[in-house]
Amino acid sequence: MTLPPLSHLDRLEAESIHILREVAAEFRAPVMLYSVGKDSSVLLHLLLKAFAPSRPPIPLLHIDTRWKFREMIAFRDRRAAETGVDLRVHINPDGVAQDVGPISHGAAVHTDIMKTQGLKQALEHGGFDAAIGGARRDEEKSRAKERVFSFRTARHRWDPKNQRPELWNLYNARTGPGESVRVFPLSNWTELDIWLYIYREKIPVVPLYFAAPRPVVERDGAWIMVDDARLPLRPGETPQLRSVRFRTLGCYPLTGAIDSDADTLEAVIAEMLVSTSSERQGRMIDHAPGASMEQKKLEGYF
């Protein structure tokens, strides 16, 4: 019997599903980080496929910084209700007590307290020994050298010089005392692969990825959306309606939009085919002094 050849997307899908099942089999208490972005949407779809028709044995964890786009939070809650997955939300109580935010405390402090420290708290409180994420190697140079099974110390730190070899599709899941693992099933996917798979599988994504007239101000070379009244306007700033969309999503004061008329999946894919810039160009935190992705990962960031 001759089987038809697998397409490029079929191979990526099969690899990711294999990794998800491997995590479920090898770890005591795995969890999947759900950031609500396009990669998380694909990962959730793969998780549902991997264990269908049963409910996935792996819960979802969202680290809420209190500054996500309102559409992201609404989409998160809607997808959790539609899929029936076990969604857990954690907000760093220390950050809430100090009222930490990107405006009052700056991008670096906000990201560290509300995201990095919040993530470490949630993993420790939940007793999770493996955290699945949607990071891809094509996103950023420090992620390009990370293993699929990325081992972290008891303090959640990543040591790029102390990782294990991965031969073919064989993964070493043995952890030492206090160690945990971050797992990246989408490591070998590209941004274009993600969008093509979303198109093929008809996966719902946050509407912010599609162009629409939105109120924005130009700040530090980026279009920042005025999502609510908490964003103070600087002298000379006046919100204007522009047709924009987002290639990446995070805390709204730290996420720049791009000018675009791509309001459909087909148009987004067509735009992707001719793009020459990084999808993370709109992440303001990546441009902050001393805030490289590798440094953040060394401190426990995903």
UniProtKB/Swiss-Prot annotation:
Q: Which Pfam families match?
A: PAPS_reduct
Any GO BP: sulfate assimilation
**Alphabetical keyword list:** ATP-binding, Nucleotide-binding, Nucleotidyltransferase, Transferase
One GO MF term, please? Answer: ATP binding
Membrane-spanning regions, if any?
none
User: What class does this enzyme belong to in the EC scheme?
Assistant: transferase
- Keyword hit for Ribosomal protein: no
- Reactions catalysed: sulfate + ATP + H(+) = adenosine 5'-phosphosulfate + diphosphate
Identify the EC number(s): 2.7.7.4
Q: What is its pathway?
A: Sulfur metabolism; hydrogen sulfide biosynthesis; sulfite from sulfate: step 1/3
Entry keyword DNA repair? no
InterPro entries documented for this protein? PAPS_reduct_dom (IPR002500), Rossmann-like_a/b/a_fold (IPR014729), SO4_adenylTrfase_ssu (IPR011784), Sulfate_adenylyltrnsfr_sub2 (IPR050128)
Report the function annotation for this chain.
Answer: With CysN forms the ATP sulfurylase (ATPS) that catalyzes the adenylation of sulfate producing adenosine 5'-phosphosulfate (APS) and diphosphate, the first enzymatic step in sulfur assimilation pathway. APS synthesis involves the formation of a high-energy phosphoric-sulfuric acid anhydride bond driven by GTP hydrolysis by CysN coupled to ATP hydrolysis by CysD.
On assembly, the entry states: Heterodimer composed of CysD, the smaller subunit, and CysN.
> So what family is this one in?
Belongs to the PAPS reductase family. CysD subfamily.
Q: What is this protein called?
A: Sulfate adenylyltransferase subunit 2
